[in-house]
A protein has these predicted regions:
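A short, polar/charged loop-to-alpha-helix boundary motif
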Residues: 37, 75-87
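Conserved beta-strand in the GNAT
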Residues: 57, 64-74
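Acidic/histidine-enriched, glycine/proline-rich intrinsically disordered or flexible terminal extensions
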Residues: 181-223
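Acyl-donor binding region in acyl/amide transferases
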Residues: 83-169
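Short, solvent-exposed loop/turn elements at beta->coil junctions and helix N-caps
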Residues: 40-47, 158-163
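C-terminal "cap" of GNAT-fold acetyltransferases
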Residues: 163-192
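Short amphipathic alpha-helix that is part of the acyltransferase structural core
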Residues: 1-45, 55-62
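Short, small/polar residue-rich loop motifs at catalytic or cofactor-binding pockets
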Residues: 50-53
Length: 223
């Protein structure tokens, strides 16, 4: 297997500082296209804080600056997926272990490989946690076409307003994680070698993860 080292590292967010760095990346990336969302994305949200999702952060090796981030929520951890709070998933989907990728963000001017390796982090995290499928929301036709080229299929015919994305309308798409390797191999997909035939030592899926701090003890003063 080929080994590829890159100019950045990807790790799970493991501290409040790293979570804030992820929010900086989100605010810059989304705020570039949606200035009205920049403020909302600059702070951790409830899903970041409840411990039911894992956020990965890409850090430039030279500058130490945060340059990319993605968040993955698993249905098996007991929290309703964000898009399913705005959209009624079909019964067949609700029976499957599934993951939602949100807040995919890369700063302007970053290495194009950052987004690819964030996708690999999401894919392998799903495989490691035995997810059957992955779901995402996409707004722009160009982005929907990108997802379709990866093997995503539409679950909606009309866009759905997402409460967690400023009520902007999104299409819901999904793909089967469990069969992806075989399908990409059989179709000679252009990313097969990168995703399944290359070792990336700069990608760490299972390092320390951020956990919500326990509540401070309440001091009881004798009456």
């Amino acid at each position: 297997m080929e080994t590829m080292t890159l100019g950045f590292r990807i790790r799970p967010v493991a501290s409040d500082v790293a979570l804030d760095d992820a929010c900086v990346v989100r605010a810059e990336s989304y705020g570039h296209h949606l200035p009205e969302m920049k403020s909302a994305y600059s702070e951790p949200d409830d899903l970041d804080r409840d411990g039911s999702a894992t956020t990965f952060l890409a850090i430039d090796k030279v500058s130490g600056a945060p340059i990319g981030s993605v968040r993955i929520q698993l249905s098996t951890l007991g929290s309703t997926l964000l898009l399913e709070r705005s959209w009624a998933a079909p019964d067949w989907l609700q029976t499957l272990p599934r993951a939602e990728l949100t807040r995919m963000s890369v700063v302007s001017g970053a290495d194009p490989m950052v987004k690819l390796l964030l996708w690999k982090a999401g894919l392998y995290y799903c495989l490691a946690n035995q997810m059957h499928c992955m779901v995402i929301g996409a707004r722009k036709p160009a982005l929907i076409r990108q997802y379709a080229s990866l093997g995503f299929e539409p679950l909606t015919t009309e866009p759905v307003p997402f409460a967690h994305a400023g009520h902007l309308p999104h299409h819901v798409l999904w793909f089967n994680v469990a069969t992806l390797e075989r399908r990409w191999y059989e179709s000679n997909h252009r990313l097969y070698g990168f995703m399944f035939g290359t070792h990336h030592p700069d990608l760490d899926l299972f390092g320390p993860r951020w956990r919500p701090s326990p509540p401070a003890p309440v001091e009881v003063v004798p009456s």
